[in-house]
Amino acid sequence: MDSFVNISIELLKGFCENLKLFSLTLLFSVPAGLLVMFCSISKFKPLKWLSKTFVWIIRGTPLMLQLFVVLYVPGLLFNTPIKVRFTAALIAFVINYACYFSEIYRGGIESVPVGQTEAGQVLGMTKSQIFFRVTLLQVIKRILAPMGNEVMTLIKDTSLANVIANKEIIMMAKEYSAKGLIWPLFSTALFFLVFVGAMTLLFNWLEKKLSYFR
């Protein structure tokens, strides 16, 4: 019988895999979301509608399905399979969350009154000056809450990587439960609760720091 300490260490190693997926997804999907957003508001209509269609497809299909597509389709169509399961999971997560973040960005930008942009133009400011000096900080304040919600969802969604055999904490807990041990499942819940709680405190602090925009 595995000892409590040994199992806890193994679960911690599994959760580190979740944290790695979470961190890298944020690192790549936040700027990728900006790129998708700029495409979706582009005045070049083919690019705009291509971007909107792509976002619609990604947001309208389950992340679990997207994981399978990323893992298997390259090998089936191009004979170039993705051999590392973590890499496949990361690609699927980045694509998925970039699309969700792009919609949050777009909503934040569109919520800033047009009059402020027009006032900047009257003052002779360039588009980039208007964006960085007038729009950006207001957008950050407006999108902070929905971004926080997506980040919380991402933390929990990392557990979906186990469906393509990426060995994270949920997969390990299931392996131990198959041996008749139920407590690793509750320990897994505790890992997620602590991390989500920490991120909640962080976003609450950020919202208070930006409350002067109210």
Residue ranges and their predicted role:
Residues 1-214:
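Transmembrane alpha-helices and adjacent helix-loop boundaries
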